[in-house]
Amino acid sequence: MNYKWNYQPPTLQEREAARALSREIGISPILCKLLQERGIHSAAEAKRFFRPQLNDLHDPFLMNDMDVAVERLNLAMGRKERILVYGDYDVDGTTAVALVFKFLQQFYSNIDYYIPDRYNEGYGVSKKGVDYAYSTGVKLVIVLDCGIKAVEEISYAKEKGIDFIICDHHVPDEVLPPAAAILNAKRPDSTYPYEHLSGCGVGFKFMQAFAQNNGIEFHQLTPLLDLVAVSIASDIVPIMGENRILAYHGLRQLNANPSIGLKAIIDVCGLAEKEITMSDIVFKIGPRINASGRIQNGKEAVDLLIEKDFASALKKSNRINSYNETRKDLDKNMTEEANKIVDNLSDLSERRSIVIFNEDWHKGVIGIVASRLTEIYYRPAVVLTRTENLATGSARSVSGFDVYKAIEHCRDLLENFGGHTYAAGLSMKVENVPEFTRRFEEYVTNHILPEQTNATIQIDAQLDFRDITPKFFFDLKKFNPFGPENHKPVFATLNVYDYGTSKVVGRDQEHIKLELVDKSRTTS
């Protein structure tokens, strides 16, 4: 794919503001310009950005229904009611379930957890899950990373005398489920100061409120922050505001003293001797946790994440790692098949979206294939497979285009859907696939901007080699953890040439090692 470089030189006013901030905090004006692009304009704001403090976390009781949720949880514990912690089968859901279960289990024993089966139940709260809760005497379900659209299922549970506390971060519909409490900063009536928490992050805020209400010291929550960091990185939520605080301290926990389960995954990933970054979570830790729900059942991931014995955790981690190897093989084969289908589309050059359907594809991998298609063809992609009488699938998008709104536009054709700006899940009757394909393409064509269909590399700053000093690199590392809204900066140096020693390296010869010359100065 050919990428277009996009660079907007700073204005005179921006350069002057960057130099002023540079004098105030003592770092390069180039990096100060990056700070200003992140909304940081003073020394005090820079200090909070570079050294996030847990004391700056928002009061959890600012979230709508938090007082009701804590009161209902306290009531359940006081009555000795059976509690079920229920969550989605992806990384965000399984880390959320592990976090809430591990914390509450310290104070209460009549508690269990449940992860729905991707293939038999599908995403979110299922009637089968409600029936399991009822059959085991559960009176309160804490549902994490899903539930905000489960009006029918939670109504069904209410008829059986089961209350729900929803901890979700997905966009709600106009009608909310009849739950005892709904914790979701994306509620239209939300007064919470930050709306981009992960599902696990919402679970953490619930436990923070519970601890606060019951006189439990905050330091008892900090060992759980490694799970929050894993969820933030894996669910690709913004890493600014409250998420930056949670991710920063979660990474410190992950590197200094990870939970037994995560330590086992770290060992299997070959990360035991290095400093773990958000990229390591995205590309190594997260996919292994996800593989459990993709290939088998997400409950195995929770079993691992709450494990207290390292030898047992290592066995479970190795088993999940084998699922990940299976996942990679499926991913490779399905992506090759998908590419052939797309390349043979007669109108590919005119299309602004991709929708493909194959009855035989593995449901657990279609989201990855959709991501691959988006990267290769640089347009929103929906990949569908057949589950019983429904076409179920995943959608992924390009930068700047809201694929959730595109899917919502076709909601009358759908049985179920949910997600975020850049990723969503959906299901429909098989006979609706052609009309969905037409309507989805129509919406994308009418709403996507020309620049959103071109692969671009956004250049953050132009610099000379002499700007790259040890102090520059040291200060740049302070921008960690990187992620959405705090991406890794891309720098450009112009008028350089190859010194003549370049060579291709790497297992698949996918990298190049070279010396470049810039104004008679060399680097390698």
Segments the model singles out, each with a brief description of its role:
Residues 411-415, 443-449:
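A common structural junction motif
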Residues 75, 171-184, 516-521:
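Acidic-glycine-rich active-site phosphate/pyrophosphate-binding loop
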Residues 459-523:
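Accessory interdomain/linker segments of ATP-dependent helicases and helicase-like nucleic-acid enzymes
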Residues 2, 10-140, 160-161, 211-435, ...:
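Hydrophobic helix-and-loop "lid/oligomerization" segment in the mid-to-C-terminal part
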Residues 114, 144, 167-169, 183-185, ...:
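Generic beta-sheet signal
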Residues 119-121, 150, 170-175, 189-191, ...:
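Short gly/pro/ser/thr-enriched loop/turn and capping motifs at secondary-structure boundaries
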Residues 99, 177-216, 221-233:
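Short alpha-helices
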Residues 150-151, 235:
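Intrinsically disordered, low-complexity regulatory tails of plant transcription factors
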